[in-house]
Structures are given as C-alpha cells and as structure tokens.
Amino acid sequence: MIYRRLFSKPIVLATLFMFSCSKNSPKTSFDKINYKKPSVSFADFIGSNQCQSCHPDIYEQWKGSTHAMAGGPATPENIIAPFNGNPITLKDAIVYPEKVNSTYQFRITELNGDLRQIVAVEAVVGKGMMYGGGTQTFFGKYDDGTYRFLPFDYSKHEATWFVQLRKDEKWVKIDPQLYLDDLYNWPPHRTLGEIDDISNCQQCHGSQIIAKKIDDVYDVKFTSLSINCESCHGPAKNHATIMSNIVQNVVNEYQTIGIESAVGISTNESLNMCFQCHAVKTPIKNNYLPGENLEEFYSLKLPLLGNENPFSINGRIKTFGYQLNHLFSDCFLSGSMDCTSCHNPHSNDYQDISKNALIGRFDDNQCLSCHVTKTSDIAAHTYHKPESEGSSCIACHMPARQHLAIGTEIKYTRADHTVSIPRPSFDSSQGFESACKQCHADISDQDLQLTVNDWYGTIKPLHPVIANRMKINERTTGADAAKVLLQPNHEHPMGQFANLSYFIKRY
C-alpha cells in the first residue's frame, strides 16, 4: 500500500528526532561477502527463467510458490474467475465476463443490449491462493501505454465477483442497485507502476516495474507480473555473465560473483527485501529497482504521521495493512526474527528457525523451535486440550484479522504479525476482537479478562513505549506528554514514531 501525502515542514523536521531512536541492525555471525553494489538499471534484469539452469532445485521451489503465481498475462493457466458469459447486472449496465477466441474481456452493454464498451483483459494479479481470502484483479492496456485496474474483481473464497465502491472504498459483492459510476475503478484510472500525476499502484504487483511519462503517453515496462528471483536478489545479468565465463574457463583470476549474497545479511536488511511489498510506505522518489537502497525511495515510517495511520498504538492493523507490523513484535524487538524465520523465501512454505520444513501454516514448531520450554506440557500453558484450536500458537498469538478498510463483506483476513499476547479488555479498548473472543463470542471481554487473570496472574506488561501512550488522556498537558512520549532511549522504532506522530498532531 502506498501513501502519497504532503507533510508540513515542522512535521518532516520533527522526524529527524527519530534517528536517535532507530534500532541498529543486529550483528550476524557471518562475514558479508565483499561486494560493491553497482548502479542498477532495467537492462540489468534477466528474469527467473535464466536462473533455472544453474539453480534447478531452488527454481522448482519458487515455481510452485505464491510469488511465482502472483500474476501474469491473461491466459487459461492464470485466470481463475468465470469468464463464462454469465452477466454481472448493474442498475445502468450489464457486464459480460467472457472469452472470445483467446481473449478474455468484459463486454459492457446498456440495459437494452446496445454495446457500450469492450475492455480486453491484458493481465491479472492474484490467483486466489491466500488462505485468509484470495482474490484476482484484472488489468486492461490502454492507448496511452498504461495498464489500468479494471473495476471487477473476483474472490475465490466467496466464489463471487465483487467491486470497490467509490464512496468509501469498501469491497462489496455485485449488487443490481449499483451504478457503474458507483465503482471506484470506473472509469479505470489506477495504473500499474508509479506515475506521479495519476492514481497508481506501486511495484508490488510485478517485478521491476518502471513507468515513465513521455509527452502524452507512458512507457510502462516490467520483467514479469510474478515476483521473480531478482525481486529479492537484485539484478542478475552480471552474475550470469561472470558465472558463465568461469564455467567456460574464460576467467581464471578471483573475482566477485556479480551479485550480492543473502548469506549473513542483517535482520533489517532481510526485512527490507520483504518490505518492498509487504509494508505500508510513503514514496520519496519513483522507479525503485531491487538492488537499490529501499529507504532512498520509500519511507517505512512516514505513514504513521498521516491522518490515516494504519496501525493501532501497539501495531495491529486497523485499516488495510501489511506485515510491517512485524516491527512491533517482541520477537523482533527482543530477538532477531525476520520473515525467513518462519517462511521459506523460495517456496513460501513454512519453516522453523532452523530452516526445517513444517507441515503447514498451523504447525506449532514454527514457534516452539524458539519457545522450547512450552513443549513439555502445552496444556499447562494454554489451559486448553493439547490438540484443540485453543492450544494452537497461531490461533492465540497471530489471530487472523479482517482488513477493515475494505469492509467485512469480502473475506480478506491476514495473520496478525505483531505476535501479541491475548489481552481481552485491552484489545477491546483498542477496537479489536481478542483472540479469546474469536472463539468465545458469547462471553464478555470483562469475563474473558478475568479468566486470563485467573490462569496467568500478572501477564507480561506492555512495552514501555506502548504503556506510556496509554497514560495520555484529555487532561495531559503538552509538557507532560513530551516527558512520557518522547523517550529516545527505548528501543521500539515504530512505537516511538507513532508516539511522535500523536504528539505532533495533538500538541
């Protein structure tokens, strides 16, 4: 998700305060390979197929991943929506999703059957693979060179077409009382790639997407609409050339392999690979390419300064967000957890901290490989039967949450990556349904909290940065708030930035 917002000069200057609050990159036990990053251009990227011959095992893992199937051209292999001619009926139009010869298209007619417009589908994003609700979005290619989001989406989980409303940007199922002009993406205006003067979606929906305006047209190019190897590893053209020469004995002396190794990178460097897409960020300049410094192109914290801050005070998503709330997790703040602690970066399957493959997303070894003291008697920790959902680490500490910015009609839940402790009363006070409440909907939050207190006594307190924010009330003066909120000695960059944002906006 991209946040394009202008900030006042005092707010921008105040962010400099946070440099003293930033968490230093943790040291690793590996020495980094001596590799000087070259400048990066689109021509330096060669695509994943070029990696297959030398890395066949890893390529096969990637080929079956959600990244590899994240999008692509409109082909039978990629389309999951029913382009069968069954009508989508609106108040002032009828839309026929259909396949004519090899072309997928939306044929839009007036109610009397007169043709209004035909929009061909050039490409798709998504294949309905996400457990919490998978969707597919469609692009048309326009005469000005842009690829534009079309207004009709498909939910695999709901087995239905849906649209996004113009009035509140919520996702809703097709309703015959809706007009075409009620749809947020009609006429199509959101484009693939970052273009300053029109609504757009950034590089997350493809690999190495570059969009530039040239007079009245746009030059849009990309390596693929899947997430390829170079999205994480950076440009591989030089690497492929060097290694080919070495194999052919063209080069005998020692030299770099032409690509930066991911072995030994810091936790923050590893996270930034994923935060290219799995983060809410504010653009600083356009046309980022993998291999460049992400934070020269995006700020990962400035969205917290906006009026639509997507995070609650302890990091949980309150609108539409991504896994950036990992940075609120104690597993990160007090440990070294990055995305690959749980996710195989090539297959996207699940693994434990030692990189051992797990049987699935709900395998408790994802957590127990670190929290080994809980393994001997899990029921003593959970107060639930060992094989029940109440004894699942994920169910209690990473509950699935609907992204409320898009409403509740179309299921679109994602695991809460703050890895929080269930606190029914606190959770309710912040507008969240606690993990306990998700199963025990008939019990009040107060009674659930009493049960938690009875079982665990005094539970682990909130991080001081979060607890300090809770101390602020309507009578707190600016001077007192500054003492409580602006504490650079604590190590909680996201929480500190959120507190700074609150202080600036209120005081």
Report each predicted region and the residues it spans.
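Bacterial N-terminal signal peptides that target proteins for export
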Residues: I2-I11
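C-terminal motif of bacterial Sec signal peptides marking the signal peptidase cleavage site
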Residues: M18-S20
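Bacterial signal peptide processing site
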Residues: S22-N24
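Primarily the internal scaffold of c-type cytochrome electron-transfer domains
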Residues: P26-P38, F42, D57-M130, T137-Y142, ...
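Local sequence-structure signature of Cys/Sec-based thiol-disulfide redox active-site neighborhoods
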Residues: S41-Q50
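Exposed beta-sheet edge/beta-hairpin loop segments within beta-rich domains
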Residues: T191-I195, C331
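Long, basic N-terminal domains or extensions that often function
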Residues: N200-C201
